[in-house]
A protein has these predicted regions:
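Conserved active-site tyrosine of GNAT-family acetyltransferases
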Residues: 17-22, 92, 119
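Conserved beta-strand-loop-alpha-helix junction that forms the acyl-donor binding cleft
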Residues: 11-14
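Short Gly/charged-rich anion-binding patches and loops
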Residues: 16-17, 87
């Protein structure tokens, strides 16, 4: 069976994106390999190795720069699941992550929306036990 292994997030700068995801969100840097022409293969992922990895791809050209921060058209485009929403919310907020709301409870679990350093929206989600998402 196939599984989603990596998604691409277009960024303005490799190092500022690494700093945000590692220092503020709490991801780990999986790989940072130099390629030709100043390009790098930069991969971050949630600590513990669960879920898909995120390839941080520096924008090349106007078309790619235009989508930075709007890769889901202003909607929540990324979903980060946790077992401890309250703890992760507090830690991330203290680290400077911008949350757009207070945590709330939905029928599928607890959720709060945050923005990455470019304005892409993410759900931090603690699925309810037994929900289709858990």
């Amino acid at each position: 069976m196939a599984r989603l292994a990596t998604i691409t997030l277009v960024v303005a700068d490799y190092d500022e994106a690494i700093a945000f995801f590692v220092e503020r969100v709490g991801f780990e840097l999986v790989e940072d390999t130099s390629l030709s022409d100043g390009k790098r293969w930069v991969v971050v992922a949630p600590r513990g190795g669960a879920g898909a990895h995120v390839l941080l791809a520096r924008a090349a050209g106007e078309e790619q720069r235009a989508v930075i921060g709007r890769q889901a058209g202003g909607r929540v485009g990324f979903f980060l699941e946790t077992d401890e929403l309250a703890d992760d919310h507090a830690r991330m907020a203290a680290a400077g992550v911008s949350f757009l709301e207070e945590p709330r409870t939905e029928r599928y679990g607890k959720v709060v929306v945050f923005e990455d350093l470019y304005g892409n929206r993410w759900d931090l989600l603690e699925p309810r036990s037994g929900s289709p998402r858990s």
